[in-house]
């Protein structure tokens, strides 16, 4: 059993180490430019990466957590890094705006209450 666990652990580490690190482009020459381009105030964390391209691609979620990056920005940065690694376009994805009536589950109830309040107010 120990051998099986060791084999799977080594395979996972080898897979993670073999992931390609793309070369900097003229559009995105360094880490600070990348973080500024993806938006959502991620450029605040540029000094954490020490402007090293390898740090951007080698650091994972726990490492960013250790450095003090908030959860939402951490997930967003890792998503954009993976998109760059796969050759996709790097652009800002704006945060969604929450609906006035809340989520899908209680929408009918909230709309009914709101309409009742509107009728009583008028």
Swiss-Prot record:
Alphabetical list of Pfam families matching this protein: SAM_Ribosomal_mS41
Transit peptide stretch: 1-10
Transmembrane segments: none
Annotated Gene Ontology cellular component terms: mitochondrion; ribonucleoprotein complex; ribosome
Keyword set, alphabetical order: Mitochondrion, Ribonucleoprotein, Ribosomal protein, Transit peptide
Signal peptide: none
SMART domains on file: IGR
Location of this chain's protein in the cell: Mitochondrion
InterPro entries: Ribosomal_mS41 (IPR039603), SAM_Ribosomal_mS41 (IPR019083)
Family note: Belongs to the mitochondrion-specific ribosomal protein mS41 family.
Functional description taken from the UniProt entry: Involved in telomere length regulation.
Annotated protein name in UniProt: Small ribosomal subunit protein mS41
Lineage, opening ranks: Eukaryota, Fungi, Dikarya, Ascomycota, Saccharomycotina
